[in-house]
């Protein structure tokens, strides 16, 4: 697997090198800085504070020493930021990492799934509940936009394991352009009394001269910025850090109403009183791009940059002389394929996450010359998954509520706005995207008034990996994240009737599915139009008129009639009440089922039989199929996907699909015994007809 990803990784490395060269010409030739002098801020009263790391003799840690990093992360936005931060760290790192993540419930749910599916070697992740820390800092008034989470770095020494001696603490809005090992090595320059390493604040905030009557917290000179911190934890315990910062904060709050910069104000107040505790770090380890930054005095040339800190509320939109260069560096990692960072640290033992070695062994046993190799490989692929990629407000619990579940790729984004107009209830959608496409999708939603207004739609990004579309894996991701008792298993190219959401909830209640524990799959009849523009029917009566006029058709009536034949459209035309239908070969209706229904079979990738296998599973588990008389959904025309084109043109593709069908039936026989015989018989009959 490594040789296949190497050209892409090399390309990304060359792009970063190009950015550094451009930066040299941007910064290195500017006479304001000069190439032969050391960058300082106002004469650098601490001497070594602003020296580039290259001017220090680094005491690098052993090759396989574990480096510990602590990050406070809460909410949906920070959960996206931390991924870009980690990409930049992983790109340069040469040491194993142990991440200590202080998270709320939202971030933990997202990041546990992400790191479990990312499967990066030599990375250990531990989680700590931020809710348990809130009482420790909730007494501190804070005006900073980060709220209570912005104060939690103060209590890290009492939260992290006692066995942990040192830790690097990072904000989520920083980007590395160097090996984090070099930052860790700066612990070796601490004196015996120094317990915290910080970069000087690169603005005049703590000088109190930014505007009239500006009264900041006390600080030593310009003060220090806490976006990047080296904490010597056992020394902090020895000096009574908890009592020290609390006494300082309580004293200052007698005259200052609140903190403005969260933990940073309190760190600076303590350092003002105890300057011997701080070890000033070279400024290049925290180049701060705030609204009033003086950071350009720090860097001499692009190669000096170690960490970029987007510490303005405006983030990437901040005004800065060299903002475009910094943004390009950040955007490089934003769109970088995270799969390419799953490389081994050669020579370091015990570095694989659980399951990786077994997966590698299974992949190694595959024969690349075998005709169905792509199918076998895709089945074994573990995709990175970022659940709830955007802000999400779950609906309040209701006993008969229904979530629409679907999956899509980048070429179907245009369906989302129409779908939101048709379906008023919650949705759980899985999107198959590259890292770069995920950022395009983010901007697409943010700029759409329709999509940005819908907070009950949960988007889950499954990152692309492999040549075949993992349709059932995507469905399972979306299904697993549905929060309502029932789910409508649909496809992205279908628009449901405007009234379908309310009608489904009413039908579930009338049929008493919940009270009777009835195993039922409610069938939503599927239709299609071949016109890109048509008047969507508001009722069953209008739909029948369009059907009779030839503007609508039963779904796939001319290509795959057996797929929906059991729905019995002739009976549906006159039906006034739900009616039961029997399973038949190749039946694949769109159904409403309980959330805990069987999952889709992930072996089916690409085109063909992915829904059919799921309906067989429902029938094998004795679900009854009930067709709803007033429900309908209409498929809109679109260009054929790559997978359906391959299915139509490649005999090998069709042979591989047939092999998957046979394996599926063998598994059915093992699980259901003689009850599964009817499915195998139906398969053999359909094969003889073909």
Curated annotation (Swiss-Prot):
GO terms for cellular component: Golgi apparatus; Golgi membrane; intracellular membrane-bounded organelle. Binds 2 Mn(2+) ions per subunit. The xylosyltransferase part binds one Mn(2+) and the beta-1,3-glucuronyltransferase part binds one Mn(2+). Residues 1-7 are cytoplasmic. SUPFAM superfamilies: Nucleotide-diphospho-sugar transferases. Residues 29-690 are lumenal. Mn(2+) 2 binds at residues 491, 493. It catalyses: 3-O-[beta-D-GlcA-(1->3)-beta-D-Xyl-(1->4)-Rib-ol-P-Rib-ol-P-3-beta-D-GalNAc-(1->3)-beta-D-GlcNAc-(1->4)-(O-6-P-alpha-D-Man)]-Thr-[protein] + UDP-alpha-D-xylose = 3-O-[alpha-D-Xyl-(1->3)-beta-D-GlcA-(1->4)-beta-D-Xyl-(1->4)-Rib-ol-P-Rib-ol-P-3-beta-D-GalNAc-(1->3)-beta-D-GlcNAc-(1->4)-(O-6-P-alpha-D-Man)]-Thr-[protein] + UDP + H(+); 3-O-{(1->[3)-alpha-D-Xyl-(1->3)-beta-D-GlcA-(1->](n)-4)-beta-D-Xyl-(1->4)-Rib-ol-P-Rib-ol-P-3-beta-D-GalNAc-(1->3)-beta-D-GlcNAc-(1->4)-O-6-P-alpha-D-Man}-L-Thr-[protein] + UDP-alpha-D-glucuronate = 3-O-{beta-D-GlcA-(1->[3)-alpha-D-Xyl-(1->3)-beta-D-GlcA-(1->](n)-4)-beta-D-Xyl-(1->4)-Rib-ol-P-Rib-ol-P-3-beta-D-GalNAc-(1->3)-beta-D-GlcNAc-(1->4)-O-6-P-alpha-D-Man}-L-Thr-[protein] + UDP + H(+); 3-O-{beta-D-GlcA-(1->[3)-alpha-D-Xyl-(1->3)-beta-D-GlcA-(1->](n)-4)-beta-D-Xyl-(1->4)-Rib-ol-P-Rib-ol-P-3-beta-D-GalNAc-(1->3)-beta-D-GlcNAc-(1->4)-O-6-P-alpha-D-Man}-L-Thr-[protein] + UDP-alpha-D-xylose = 3-O-{(1->[3)-alpha-D-Xyl-(1->3)-beta-D-GlcA-(1->](n+1)-4)-beta-D-Xyl-(1->4)-Rib-ol-P-Rib-ol-P-3-beta-D-GalNAc-(1->3)-beta-D-GlcNAc-(1->4)-O-6-P-alpha-D-Man}-L-Thr-[protein] + UDP + H(+). Its EC number is 2.4.-.-, 2.4.2.-, 2.4.1.-. GO terms for molecular function: dystroglycan binding; glucuronosyltransferase activity; glycosyltransferase activity; metal ion binding; xylosyltransferase activity. Pathway: Protein modification; protein glycosylation. Residues 343-686 are annotated as: Glucuronyltransferase activity. Keywords: Glycoprotein, Glycosyltransferase, Golgi apparatus, Manganese, Membrane, Metal-binding, Multifunctional enzyme, Signal-anchor, Transferase, Transmembrane, Transmembrane helix. It is a single-pass type II membrane protein. This is Xylosyl- and glucuronyltransferase LARGE2.
